[in-house]
Amino acid sequence: MTAATQPATPAAPNNNEPVRVNHTARNVIITIVVVAIIAVAAFFGYRAFAGANESSAKGSKGNPVKIGVVGATNPEWVKFKQDAEKAGIYVDIVDFQDYTSENPALDSGELDLNEFQHLLYLANYNVSNKKDLQPIGGTAIYPLGVYSTKVKDIKDLKQGDTVTIPNDETNQARAIGVLKAAGLVTLKGYWTAFSTPAYIDEAKSKVKVTPLKAEQVATTLKDPTIAAGVINNDYVAD
């Protein structure tokens, strides 16, 4: 299997992106759909999927396939594990609170696979860290949304409001694309897959942007000084 390669830079989002509003018991969720196909990544090197005998073979009861995810208790993983065992493959779903730890864990041999990232994130990780993790398949398509407990409609955000976004390089750029599509920020030039807050023209933008670790963005919605946050699907809970 060949090494992961840098995918083509996606086109800049436009102001006609669909906006979906989902009212829940605890939160008003304002979702601007900027999707990513989540890839399953693996490291094929000195570790092999099969051992010398059946008792130690990778996928056996004594040596399950370890898959790193965020949200191991989600219903889909319970069903996946059950179906895998019916097929004779034992799986250990390893939960991570911080998805930035998953690729290092895969590279070190703590995991056999992980499932959390889109291809751009994986390619950027490989290039930045001189690694060779392999994408072996796509699993799901997730939106990146704007969430708020303060307003019911994205149009209700006020001039000067603060919006938090993930600070990892590729998801930060996606979040900026979401805010641009919603008309909340104006960029100094074109949006790219590696746009940073430095690309934002603060004087012409409606909101202020604060980058934080992805797992912290959702908790900022409880802060009275934060109007909204762009939250990765892994950290969204009703």
Residue ranges of model-derived segments:
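Short, low-complexity disordered leader/linker segments with a strong preference
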Residues: 1-64
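Short helices/loops that flank or line small-molecule/ion binding pockets
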Residues: 82-83, 100-112, 177-178, 197-230, ...
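Short beta-strand-centered segments that line the small-molecule binding cleft or hinge
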Residues: 111-114, 132-138
